[in-house]
């Protein structure tokens, strides 16, 4: 069997007397979109935060491509090729599209200007950003130099996704990527997710939107009471089944139980 891109075993995270993650397991396979669903307070965001370094587990281990890792911050995870598209997008409204694409990893000019004056190579950054947006069919903006605050909600989401796809070498985490978007903009984001998957980049998708989950996910990780309840194939179950598993109204089949 192919080694999972990321695997978590027996993860525990406590906040005082509250156990947010209770000996939970997790697995993301190569080239897939894995949706993570669960009721509010189920711990789905907590397990993903543990994987990307936003929190440090109290117990358990995390393996990236079969090798144990321990991230102390999301920056360390990013350096290993793990990108995150946050629900709030983490974009700087006043900065240009190109500047947002390169926040924290700007390209400096060659020679003394870059070495001593730390001058940025704006043309190189703008070309890279333009190329990446074009690859994903997102060059509907007027200019790569325009501030992000002038973009629509869907276009901003596209910039965040393009940034993640441009630099991810392991996988991408997307937190509620269609939240607060209209029908047309949501459709574009779903197409982007499928496009990124087609490029071979696996995705962890956290979402409450069941129709969207069932449309793009290859597998669905159902989280309940701080741990993985089961992982199901959306082709074999209905949205009603998933909600019933998630809320405890229905027991998952024995062969799918984690």
PLM features per residue range, with description:
Residues 2-258:
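Glycine-rich phosphate-binding loops of nucleotide-dependent enzymes
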